[in-house]
């Protein structure tokens, strides 16, 4: 875990320590953060200041000691695993090799040694490696402890504050964000998933995934429909029009819908994923990512999503 300004640790742990605004008051969770393990401590570290101000929370040099509070057996009621930020390598695919799996194994070692387990929440996706992620799920089931994971976007504010009617017959969905291979993808995927899983019949699973980048992405953009190899352009336009952070392709007071030529100039390294669900739902994630080194690029700064029902309604 890394703990600095605007880090995931600050966003999550500070809310446990300080509380947060909820409805018409300030909510303080009815639980205590009693121990902390921080792997990399830089000049901008906040963990030491937080521990000094909240003496009930102690920092330990290892994950095992944090879980046992310096003793021999598990002594906490729940575990929060945050493997984000810090100095870790990338692989050839651009994935950030965060050690979430390795952290998880150290947690499980304490569970096994103690003869009991506790629920664990893993911030964002389980791992960059599919086999690691599957092993984490299999281990939690074999040891019978709750394992939860995911992005914060499904539970953040929505503008407007709407949702799909429960049981809605959804035909196709598109979600848009500003890129970020691996780390950024999970956010927009989960934001869309939290909405479409309310569809008629509930979640059925995904049977196929297709990724587009480079020339294949722009060909898919021009295809005009899912059946032609792309996605619904009306849904894409709806996403861009709903964005509160749509970057105008030219100086103007109001939003301007970018053309394909604008998008190529502003977001030359864009990519997309198409998901085919077992019940026939088609969904696409479009990531308008600026080219490497492009400081004035980008299209949107927020995440937006649109869906078409079987009767044609958006």
Regions found by a protein language model. Give the residues of each.
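Short, hydrophobic/proline-enriched secondary-structure or compact coil segments at domain edges
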Residues: 173-176, 273-277, 298, 304-305
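Short, solvent-exposed loop/turn motifs
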Residues: 281-282, 313
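Short helix/loop capping segments that flank catalytic or ligand/cofactor-binding pockets
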Residues: 184, 284-285
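N-terminal glycine-/serine-/threonine-rich beta1-alpha1-beta2 phosphate-ribose binding loop
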Residues: 1-119, 135, 141-142, 199-208, ...
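A contiguous active-site-proximal alpha/beta segment in oxidoreductase catalytic domains
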Residues: 105, 115-196
């Amino acid at each position: 875990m890394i703990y600095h300004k605007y880090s995931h640790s600050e966003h999550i742990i500070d809310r446990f320590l300080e509380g947060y605004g909820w409805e018409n008051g300030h909510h303080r969770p009815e639980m205590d953060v009693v121990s902390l393990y921080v792997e990399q401590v830089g000049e901008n570290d906040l963990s030491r200041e937080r521990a000094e101000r909240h003496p009930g929370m102690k920092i330990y040099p290892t994950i095992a000691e944090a879980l046992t509070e310096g003793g021999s057996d598990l002594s906490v009621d729940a575990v929060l695993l945050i493997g984000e930020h810090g100095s870790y390598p990338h692989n050839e695919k651009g994935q950030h090799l965060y050690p979430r799996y390795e952290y998880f194994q150290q947690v499980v070692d304490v569970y096994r040694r103690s003869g009991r387990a506790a629920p664990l929440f893993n911030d964002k996706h389980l791992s960059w490696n599919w086999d690691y992620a599957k092993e984490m799920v299999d281990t939690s089931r074999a040891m019978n402890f709750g394992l939860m994971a995911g992005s914060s976007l499904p539970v953040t504010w929505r503008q407007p504050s709407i949702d799909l009617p429960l049981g809605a017959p959804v035909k196709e969905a598109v979600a848009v964000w500003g890129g970020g291979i691996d780390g950024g993808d999970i956010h927009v995927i989960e934001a869309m998933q939290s909405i479409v899983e309310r569809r008629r019949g509930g979640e059925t699973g995904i049977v196929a995934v297709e990724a587009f980048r480079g020339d294949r992405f722009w060909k898919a953009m021009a295809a005009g429909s899912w059946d032609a190899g792309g996605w619904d352009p009306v849904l894409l336009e709806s996403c861009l029009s709903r964005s509160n952070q749509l970057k105008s392709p030219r100086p103007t007071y109001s939003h301007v819908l970018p053309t394909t030529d604008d998008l190529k100039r502003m977001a030359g390294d864009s990519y997309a994923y198409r998901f085919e669900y077992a019940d026939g739902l088609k969904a696409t994630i479009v990531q308008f990512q600026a080219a490497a080194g492009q400081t004035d690029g980008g299209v949107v700064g927020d995440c937006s999503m649109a869906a078409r029902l079987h009767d044609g309604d958006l």
